[in-house]
């Protein structure tokens, strides 16, 4: 069985309330349910983690290598400046795919750069919750995980 960890960063617990014109009305819990439902027939365990605290995200990334085959991460605002999260991502030997709900390249100038992308296999941006599904599909179909 493959084990994938989905990490969500700061303020994503506010989805459904925060800036619905950008993020829509879907909640993080709804996103997690849609992901689980999409992969219900796969031999796959998906765990979800969300924190507004950088240190907790770093700890979870570092610990993930013991339990998971891959990570899907939405670092949210931390993607634009957290060298600490970048370093944690670089320190592990499992694949990481970065996801953003909105198209960061259509946003404010300071949101157009993702420092964490440097440690990601790829970045999926602008497809809403479906970006998480795309990331997991990529991991399952293109990487030799759990073998």
From Swiss-Prot:
Gene Ontology molecular function: 3-dehydroquinate dehydratase activity
Residues that coordinate or bind substrate: 74, 80, 87, 101-102, 111
Cross-referenced InterPro entries: DHquinase_II, DHquinase_II_CS, DHquinase_II_sf
Annotated site, Transition state stabilizer, chain positions: 18
Origin organism lineage: Bacteria, Bacillati, Bacillota, Clostridia, Eubacteriales
Entry keyword Lyase: yes
Record: active site: 23, 100
Organism (species): Clostridium botulinum (strain Loch Maree / Type A3)
Family, similarity comment: Belongs to the type-II 3-dehydroquinase family.
Pfam families: DHquinase_II
Function statement: Catalyzes a trans-dehydration via an enolate intermediate.
Pathway: Metabolic intermediate biosynthesis; chorismate biosynthesis; chorismate from D-erythrose 4-phosphate and phosphoenolpyruvate: step 3/7
GO BP, one annotated term: chorismate biosynthetic process
UniProt subunit comment: Homododecamer.
Entry keyword Transmembrane: no
Reactions catalysed: 3-dehydroquinate = 3-dehydroshikimate + H2O
Name of this protein: 3-dehydroquinate dehydratase
PROSITE patterns assigned: DEHYDROQUINASE_II
Enzyme Commission (EC) number: 4.2.1.10
The entry's keywords: Amino-acid biosynthesis, Aromatic amino acid biosynthesis, Lyase
